[in-house]
C-alpha cells in the first residue's frame, strides 16, 4: 500500500512509548495516534461528500527515525495505521475497527468498548438493544443506521471483494462489490485530505494520544461519522459499465457455439443449488448459508420483485384469515352471552315462582250485598244483627179460634203481633209470575192457644218496624204488593190464607199454605216447619202490579185448627 502524507501543525503530534517496550530501540516504538478531524465544509472540494464528514484515524505505526533534522509536520502512514469509526448503540459508545470488520461481521471481534474488543452482537447486547433482530439497524454511525450506510456503499466490510462468507445478506450485493471501500491512509483516491479555510490556513487537527491499555476515548461533540466513498454518479457509472474483456469473453463463447451448452450448465447448477436449499430445509433448520445463496440469486437475477409479490399475496391471505377468525370469535362471544342470559332466565323464573308460592294468599273480601230498591213511600228499617227484634202489634188483626177468619189490611205489612207473640211478615222484590217462598214458622210456648209467631227468613229484608198505637196508622203504611212470604202455621195445624183484591175486577190472589209436619219432632206444638209456597197470579193482575204501584186491601187470613 502506497504511503500518503497527512499534514498537521507542528507540535500537535505527541509520540508516547507504550509500556513493555522500554528495552527496545526508541526508534521502533509503537504509538497510538487518534486524529480527530473537524467537519468538512460542503463545496470546498469537488470530490467532497454531500454531508459533513469526519475521519477518526487510530494509528499504531512505527516511526523508524526521529531525528532533529526531520520535519515533524509530515508523518508517514504505513500499513500499520488502523481506521476506526465511532459508533453508538442507545446510550453506549464504542469504536468500530474497520480492518477487523470482515464479513459477516456479526460475531467478529471488531468493536472496542470499554477497553475490550468484542463483537457487534455482544456490543448490541451490552447496550440493551438485544431485542432488535438486525444488529446493523441497532448500531448507528453518526446517527445513521449502519445498514443504511452499507446499503448506500458508504461503508463495507474490510476487503469484502476478496473475503466474503456469503452470509452478509446485503440488499445491494452487486453495488457493494463494485463500490469503493472505506478510506484507508495511503490510498490517494480514498483519503480525505485536510481541508483549508478561506484564508489559506490549515484547519487545526486535534490530536489526542492514549495508550492501548488505557480505558475509553475522549469524545468530541464536533465528531461526525458520515464517511462518503464516492458520489452517486460515480457509483452508477461503475455499476452500469462492463469491461471490454468481459464483453469479448462472452462474445467468443457465442461465436464458437458454446452458448447453449453454457446456459444449460448454468441452469442445471442453479437448479441443483436451489434443490439443495430445499432439501436442507426439510432435514434441518434454515441455515445462514442458504439465506446468502437465495439472496445472491434473487439480487443477481432481479427476482426481488417476485419475492415481494409472493410475500404480498401471503400477507393478504393472512389478513383475510385473521378477519375471518375475528368474526368467528365475535360470533362465539355473542352466542356465549346469549347462553348465559338463557341460563339466568330459568333461575329468575324459578325464584319468582318460589316467591309466589311462599307469598301469603289473601282471601278476597265477599262482595257487598246490593241494596234493594223500594218505593219512595216506604221507610228503611235496619234489623238488629244480634237478636230477633220484637215488634208492636198492628191492628186491625184478629186471631180467632179454629174455623174463624181474620183479616189484615194493606198487605204486606211489617209486623203483626198480639200480646207477647208477635206475627212477622216479610216481602221480597217483585219477580216473575211464579214466586217461591220459604220461611220458618214456630209457635212460642204459651198458655194462649191463639198465639202465632212468624220469624223472618235470612234472605228477606224488613220493611218496617214501626210501633203502631191505633189502627188509623195502618192506612198510611200501604205498600206495593211484592212477592209475599207469608207463614202462619204451627206443626199439626191447617191454615188457609186467602188474599182477596177488592179493588181489582179481573181476578183475585189466593195463597195456600199446606202443613208439612216434622217427622222427627216429638212435640208437634214446639217445632218449626219449613214451608214452600207458590204464589200464582193471573197475568193481567201481575202486569198491572209491575206497571203501577197498586195497593191490595182486605186480605183475609183464615187459620184452621185440627
Curated annotation (Swiss-Prot):
Residues 72-156 form the SAND domain. One of its GO terms (biological process) is positive regulation of transcription by RNA polymerase II. One of its GO terms (cellular component) is nucleoplasm. Keywords: Acetylation, Coiled coil, Cytoplasm, DNA-binding, Metal-binding, Nucleus, Transcription, Transcription regulation, Zinc. The keyword Cytoplasm applies. Residues 360-384 are annotated as: Disordered. Residues 311-357 form a coiled coil. Zn(2+) binds at residues 103, 160, 164, 168. DNA binds at residues 129, 133, 136, 147. One of its GO terms (molecular function) is sequence-specific double-stranded DNA binding. It comes from the Eukaryota. It is found in: Nucleus; Cytoplasm. It holds the Pfam family SAND. Residues 375-384 have a biased composition (Polar residues). The modification N-acetylalanine is found at residue 2. InterPro entries: SAND-like_dom_sf, SAND_dom. Homodimer, and heterodimer of GMEB1 and GMEB2. Interacts with the glucocorticoid receptor (NR3C1) and NCOA2/TIF2. May interact with HSP27 and CREB-binding protein (CBP). Interacts with TRIM63. Trans-acting factor that binds to glucocorticoid modulatory elements (GME) present in the TAT (tyrosine aminotransferase) promoter and increases sensitivity to low concentrations of glucocorticoids. Also binds to the transferrin receptor promoter. This is Glucocorticoid modulatory element-binding protein 1. It comes from Rattus norvegicus.
